[in-house]
Structures are given as C-alpha cells and as structure tokens.
C-alpha cells in the first residue's frame, strides 16, 4: 500500500515533527498549501504565496 499522502507532508527532525508545507492563512490549521516550485497554493480557497518575489522595476 505504501505511505498515506498526508504522512508525506511531515518529517521528524531531532525527535520533533515538522511540517514540510505551510498551512493556509485563510483556511487555518489542517489545510496544507501545495508546493508548486516558485509558489505555494491552497487547493481549497485558491490563496497563493510566491516564494521569491522579484523586486518591482523603478520608473524613471
């Protein structure tokens, strides 16, 4: 059968359980955000956070 999908979102370091992905700030604890490389996205409400935001271009 393998490992349940939800179990893959946690890892154990130094005897403590740590989340690999953040929880959605809108939906609250228990709703993980999906990791899409350059961003995290919530599948429930659609909230998106970008990991590396480029600096806005300055107008002259």
UniProtKB/Swiss-Prot annotation:
Protein's name in the database: Small ribosomal subunit protein eS31
Cofactor: Zn(2+)
MF term (GO), any: structural constituent of ribosome
Protein family according to the UniProt entry: Belongs to the eukaryotic ribosomal protein eS31 family.
Subunit structure: Part of the 30S ribosomal subunit.
Organism taxonomic ancestry: Archaea, Methanobacteriati, Methanobacteriota, Methanomada group, Methanopyri
Keyword match Metal-binding: yes
C4-type zinc finger segments: 24-45
The UniProt record lists the keyword Ribonucleoprotein: yes
Cofactor binding note: Binds 1 zinc ion per subunit.
Binding site for Zn(2+): 24, 27, 42, 45
InterPro entries: Ribosomal_eS31, Ribosomal_eS31_arc, Ribosomal_zn-bd
Annotated Pfam families: Ribosomal_S27
Organism from which the protein derives: Methanopyrus kandleri (strain AV19 / DSM 6324 / JCM 9639 / NBRC 100938)
Keywords of this entry: Metal-binding, Ribonucleoprotein, Ribosomal protein, Zinc, Zinc-finger
UniProt-listed NCBIfam families: PRK00432.1
HAMAP family, alphabetized: Ribosomal_eS31
GO CC, one annotated term: ribosome
């Amino acid at each position: 059968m393998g490992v349940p999908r939800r179990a893959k979102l946690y890892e154990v370091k130094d005897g403590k359980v740590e989340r690999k992905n953040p929880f959605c700030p809108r939906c609250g604890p228990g709703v993980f955000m999906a990791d899409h490389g350059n961003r995290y996205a919530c599948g429930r409400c659609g909230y998106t956070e970008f990991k590396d935001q480029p600096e806005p271009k300055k107008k002259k």
